[in-house]
Amino acid sequence: MIVSPHKASRIPGNRLRKALMASAALVGLMSAGQLWAFNLDDVAAKAKDLAGQKYEAPKSNLPAVFRDMKFADYQKIRFLQEKAEWAKDKTPFKLSFYHQGMHFDTPVKINEVTATTVEEIKYDPSRFEFGDVPHDPETTKNLGYAGFRVLYPINKADKQDEIMTLLGASYFRVVGKGHVYGLSARGLAIDTALPSGEEFPRFTEFWVEKPKPADKHLVIYALLDSPRSTGAYKLILRPGNDTVVDVQSRVFLRDHVSRLGIAPLTSMYLFGPNQPSKVMNYRPALHDSEGLSIHAGNGEWLWRPLNNPKHLSVSNFSVENPRGFGLMQRHRDFKDYEDLDDNYQKRPSAWIEPKGDWGKGTVDLVEIPTADETNDNIVAFWSPETLPEPGKPFEYDYRMHWTIDESRFQAQELGSVTQTMRSTGDVKQSNLIRQPDGSVAFLVDFAGPALAALPEDAAVRSQISVGDNAEVVENNLRYNPETKGWRLTLRMKIKEANKATEMRAALVRDVPVEAAKPAEEAKHDKTAAKHGKAEKAAKAEQSANAEQPAADAASTNGTPATTEKVLTETWSYQLPADE
């Protein structure tokens, strides 16, 4: 009921004044809370301010005893879990910290954000057990934390496990339920694989929101800094079978860059079936990731098996508005790796899902030679065609999926590449002995529900393209009853071994063109029907149309018109130089 002001009861003056004062106080408190609440804008303001200043390289405060230690000694410095941040609070997430040591010689500032405060989490040496590492307690007084870990009961309700680690430059790693650490992500990559040298931006300060008891996510803010860039990042961590990280970024350039890497991923590939080990090894494969997957804006899916080349290799895949890309580990059986210690079958894939349109650019793949598995030698990122101008902010938001269920990030309506195998090419002689003929052979298995639904005698064929540096001597496609898919065998002779060779393949089949649907019968015009003229005209038109072939109907010789249907993702491979 609306009460007329003229009929409303009058409130005594003192009561009115008290009510107004209480309301004003409440509004003030609410406004203060809303104005104070820490968010990405606060970090972006710091980043913008930094971008207008000359870059100051971080200074190491590390005593020689920690700076010169070996990795085995660094591992002896153990964080005491009972002293984790929020250990005594009923929060689902806890934080533990990395001590400075080796090349982690510069501290990062870590802050706790609550509803009313932002306070630095100060370094405390009593949180660590140093074992037999010789050190003077006085030398640790002015140190800081090198980074931190996020703990969460992801596998067992009564056990806090690491689900995220942030240590070094702008690197971070994430796992889901049942995973072990594998590949890494970074905040930003600059001039990767260029002769001028790569610049590694660094997270210098973090703000972590203290979670409430019922929270299923953790919010982390980060400030990024480097000679030519600054940035503000918001990471929302959501643990689960697949752990998801939502990333918001606002970046400023101090100076021009030649190549910008957005959503960069870093991994390791030593050897596998498409590039067997040169040294005898009981493991069939050794890698954190085995291929780059790309879902282009036009709907195409591409699969690029990784290499450990003898020379630096950079591949660029032109994509407009990518729907997703990632470094993937598709093989998930223990027998694929046979490694009881490192469990490569449990190492996650990372899939980048852009939010919004990213425009024109390339997904870049960098492959670096490595002699062992301790070096990350694979990098993948999105590189925009138009580079931002210094001083002008740019934003890229995306979702990262850390998963061991790669089928969720493949085209359900297409077959996928399940393995790529390389072999010495040979020809079977009349005596049934196989004789090498100087060629190299690739066997590519395509499988999946879409292919399994086809009869084994379906007229499936391969569609291939090979660069000028190779001559194809065999292109053979066979049904594989073991996988209910098809196996493609490509054998080719390489013209110049010191050059890389590109090749692509997909499976297709011809399908009938759908006949054009007959036009809907015209409704009788009432006036024309009344006079009988419209009906007569319609009959004459129908008779004429019956004598004309439909646009896509059978040709004059009775053969149905067909169109080519793509059945699989595109297999794209580069045979490295000097292989």
UniProtKB/Swiss-Prot annotation:
GO terms for CC? outer membrane-bounded periplasmic space
List the residue ranges of the region (Disordered).
Answer: 516-579
InterPro entries, per database record: Gal_mutarotase_sf_dom, GH-type_carb-bd, Glucan_biosyn_MdoG/MdoD, Glucan_biosyn_MdoG_C, Ig-like_fold, Ig_E-set, MdoG_OpgG
Q: Which UniProt keywords apply?
A: Periplasm, Signal
Please give the chief subcellular localization of this protein. periplasm
Which residue ranges have biased composition labelled Basic and acidic residues? 517-539
Compartments annotated for it: namely: Periplasm
- Pathway it belongs to? Glycan metabolism; osmoregulated periplasmic glucan (OPG) biosynthesis
Highest taxon in the source lineage: Bacteria
Do the record's keywords include Signal? yes
Q: Which N-terminal residues, if any, form the signal peptide?
A: 1-37
An example GO biological process term is: beta-glucan biosynthetic process
Q: Is the keyword ATP-binding assigned to this protein?
A: no
One MF annotation (Gene Ontology) recorded for this entry: carbohydrate binding
Q: What does this protein do?
A: Involved in the biosynthesis of osmoregulated periplasmic glucans (OPGs).
The UniProt family comment states: Belongs to the OpgD/OpgG family.
Name listed for the protein in its UniProt record = Glucans biosynthesis protein G
